[in-house]
Amino acid sequence: MAQNNAVAGFNALNGVELSLFTTDELKAIHYATMEVLMNPGVQVSDPEARQIFKENGCEVDEKTSIVKIPEYLVRRALQLAPSRFVLWGRDKKYNTVQEAGGKVHWTCFGTGVKMCKYQDGKYVTVDSVEQDIADIAKLCDWAENIDYFSLPVSARDWAGKGAQDVHETLTPIANTAKHYHHIDPVGEHVDYYRDIVKAYYGGDEEEARKKPIFSMLLCPTSPLELSVNACQVIIRGARFGMPVNVLSMAMSGGSSPVYLAGTLVTHNAEVLSGIVLAQLTVPGAKVWYGSSTTTFDLKKGTAPVGSPELGLISAAVAKLAQFYGLPSYVAGTOSDAKIPDNQAGHEKTMTCLLPALAGANTIYGAGMLELGMTFSMEQLVIDNDIIKMVKKAMQGIPVSPETLAVESIQKVGIGNNFLALKQTRMLVDYPSSPMLIDRRMFGDWAASGSKDLAAVANEKVQDILKNHQVPPVDADILKDMQAIVDKADRAFKEG
């Protein structure tokens, strides 16, 4: 239920909070998860990961690759995992704290494979390329309500031609001063990522560990599997001091039970198994509790991300992460619409607001369309407005002697207005004030060209791409970073 005057995830003491579960219900999900981790357990495809589990007391069947994780190891891992860590930006003013029970932050969606391009009021979809990543990074650098950058689309122009994921590492770092979260890393290439970050710090690995400008995301395979790639991202990320996001993408009714509570059980087992592996590898490794879990539309045969179920699951995951004392990273601001239209606005607001009120530490989805397949730069700048308005709603209605304003009411008296009051003029920024969403009357809107929101957003996108300046990486350092990408490309071509 919604409660007024509760501590919100956003920086407000009198905000609105979504409680969602009782403590007993959270415990019930936890204990059900502990049963599942022992029976049937989790299939772990990576031999190195199985050995780590085995050496630390797990029952491991090498024939089936099934690992059974006892509750005491889960509890130990939760004690070791930090409840707070900092995501560093190239510019420290963009440093972002991820903290269980702390502020809510937003990042863009990832990872799509297409771009929705706006051209003279019409839309076309094309494969995403490396330049799209650079352009979106620049937009996110500008967007005041996007706190850090997540890989939004794939550099498909490099698919089969070079080390695509390594290109997807350098390009964002060079095009935004905000922290970069790689959503599609390759386990065997984590060494390249480390070397790129080290090069940024002039070869100083200790500095790179202390001030991580780069982090990674991996997904268990639902139901109840950790792939070789997922394990290697966890293991190498932990060893190199990179924050790692263990994010399940279960689908209720498909790869998890049709009941959302049951889906939370398998989701929880998948994420906790990855977090346990991280802590067994390096105690104190920085980890998120992640979710892109949604429902499976049994009638349409799709996995919608603009659904109320996604918003509820993301809110539930935020509460589970708080229960465990872990920072959370969840899907939201999501839509199944194909273009920036009415459907997109409705679905994005709904899926943004629910996890925000639950106190999720990061909500990702800005810019995303078409069930997560497509990215729109126009939608990104619209979502920047939606997020701003959700932040305002999270603040609730603070009640204090100042905000009750009895003296102002008495001063103005009956039948007058408050516009001339000094207090009103001083608080001109107090009411919500979106940048693109239009609040004018019809006549004024028509006189300015009758432009719809997507057209206005397109103009804003073009202005940002032309005029926004991103602080550059030092030329010599960038050359060293590029040399690592070139090395990865040569290794790819040599096979």
Curated annotation (Swiss-Prot):
Gene3D superfamilies from the xrefs? Answer: Trimethylamine methyltransferase-like (3.20.20.480)
- Enzyme class, broadest EC rank: transferase
Task: Give the EC number.
Answer: 2.1.1.250
**UniProt keyword Membrane, yes or no:** no
Instruction: State the source organism's domain of life.
Output: Archaea
| GO terms of biological process kind | methanogenesis; methylation
Under Pfam families, the record lists: MTTB
Q: Does the keyword GTP-binding apply?
A: no
For this UniProt record, the keywords arranged alphabetically read as follows: Methanogenesis, Methyltransferase, Pyrrolysine, Transferase
The GO molecular function terms of this record are: trimethylamine methyltransferase activity
The annotated pathway is: One-carbon metabolism; methanogenesis from trimethylamine
What catalytic activity is recorded? Co(I)-[trimethylamine-specific corrinoid protein] + trimethylamine + H(+) = methyl-Co(III)-[trimethylamine-specific corrinoid protein] + dimethylamine
Q: What does this protein do?
A: Catalyzes the transfer of a methyl group from trimethylamine to the corrinoid cofactor of MttC.
Quote the subunit structure annotation.
Can form a complex with MttC.
Family statement drawn from the similarity comment of this UniProt entry: Belongs to the trimethylamine methyltransferase family.
Q: What is this protein called?
A: Trimethylamine methyltransferase MttB2
Which species does the entry assign this protein to?
Methanosarcina mazei (strain ATCC BAA-159 / DSM 3647 / Goe1 / Go1 / JCM 11833 / OCM 88) (Methanosarcina frisia)
From the UniProt record, report the name of the gene that encodes this protein: mttB2
